[in-house]
């Protein structure tokens, strides 16, 4: 398959090297276009008021891989690849492997998921891969599963246009309990701003935070209750696959507001 791979951790990240090399070694036609530096939690931002530069990168990846480092956001990278760098569209857009989970409401901030979402917006099935640890350096099990999943999709394509958000627990391959189709949960954070003063007396802030609670999504979303939540299955060493789409229309909200009047005066 022809694959485009991006990420938000940057061109030097171990996760994207492990993923891209594994897929190239499996015989796929792999192109990498990703940020030239760390761009985590940039969401779906695009660069509009300055030029975007992309440089060919050699010696980082498998010799069969063509790679570019881009000074834009993750979404910039995918958009640039699809419209300017690639000679023909890929069969799949992949993003990752991210260093850290993208579960629940975290996906709204995620550059990893947004890069994959950009592929889906352009009509290409896409997958975001995340290793649910900020410290583990063992991306091999995640890359192994990614290779298996891509091979499966080559034989049996995704039946509808969607993004698969895949989170892999940070354990050895033999310790993975299985794979489960999941629905998106809710992760609430307590955000703390660390206030500091620079040598010139100017105030600045560092945003820190930790998970406060993991809760069920609202019932009004009409999601099947028999489908487990992503944050729960990963905790039990299952791989989580959550199908996503970009249409954020709240169908229940339309129903609840259908009898409202919205006067202009």
From Swiss-Prot:
Binds 1 divalent metal cation per subunit. Its cofactor is a divalent metal cation. Keywords: Cytoplasm, Hydrolase, Metal-binding, Nucleotide-binding. It comes from the Bacteria. It is found in: Cytoplasm. Disulfide bonds: none annotated. Its EC number is 3.1.3.5. GO terms for cellular component: cytoplasm. A divalent metal cation binds at residues 8-9, 40, 98. It catalyses: a ribonucleoside 5'-phosphate + H2O = a ribonucleoside + phosphate. GO terms for molecular function: 3'-nucleotidase activity; 5'-nucleotidase activity; exopolyphosphatase activity; metal ion binding; nucleotide binding. SUPFAM superfamilies: SurE-like. Belongs to the SurE nucleotidase family. Nucleotidase that shows phosphatase activity on nucleoside 5'-monophosphates. This is 5'-nucleotidase SurE.
